[in-house]
């Protein structure tokens, strides 16, 4: 507890980012398998199996934020990948060929883990990686929700895929799946998501103690550390800091007052994040909510596999227009 008093959540965030990548590189060096996974996948399965996992979308965003994306995009397009593909895909496909980035290296994968609840691009992106690298792919095919609520047949379909994926992971690792540990990971993942939600909800206070662009920074860890104790500790720390600021009546910045509050819809513009932040701050504009970071508020009851299936099927990018309109209003 004393460490928490000395350490800010931002300090801890930076430590965890370094720990995440160093751990994956070390696992590879020790001959352990490494997984590349999409950002909103059933990571609880991977956490249960103690598989070192890297998220190419996080990595591509980091490369973009450091102005290093062009080399990888040009490489991917030179191999025939269309410029219509998102830069996340093109940066990663380029990195899979070059395998070196000044911003941050990641180990090459032994297994791919893909869930199509965020977009359809990830399907062909990961299929191409699987074919090029000659490694197995575990794919969760997520039907789009044309109805307002997630239909029961979609929940059953996704649950069946989760159950099948457990068998695939057992075949890949040559180890049995530990269902007791799975329950613990599910519980921790939900608790972490709850602290993430509680922390970001402080933006509802006027003035907001939260600088909305911080959500994009902390988001890296809600992607890759939802199911472990470090992620839980981080978001509890962040929540407590924001609560203290709110009670003290402090706004998002020390050098400016919050005058306008806006919602950010969609993905951050990673190469120009600083420019965007400074331009908005100059006019007292604070981004207090976004449809993007809330995507990782994946919650369900412990040991409820159908609830877990529904939670992963419920991502706003996988919902119909009526639902998305109401989500924006909420």
Indicate where each model-derived feature is located.
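Short, flexible loop segments at the rims of nucleotide/cofactor-binding pockets, characterized by
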Residues: 11-14, 86-93, 316-325
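A structural signal for short, well-ordered beta-strand segments and their strand-loop junctions
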Residues: 35-37, 53-56, 112-114, 136-141, ...
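An N-terminal, globular interaction/scaffold subdomain
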Residues: 37-105, 110, 117, 125-126
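Redox- and metal-dependent alpha/beta enzyme cores, enriched for Fe-S-associated oxidoreductases
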Residues: 48-77, 267-330
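A polyampholytic, Gly/Pro-enriched intrinsically disordered region
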Residues: 76-84, 156-168, 307-317
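Internal, well-ordered alpha/beta segment that forms a basic, Gly-enriched binding/recognition surface
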Residues: 95-97, 102-202
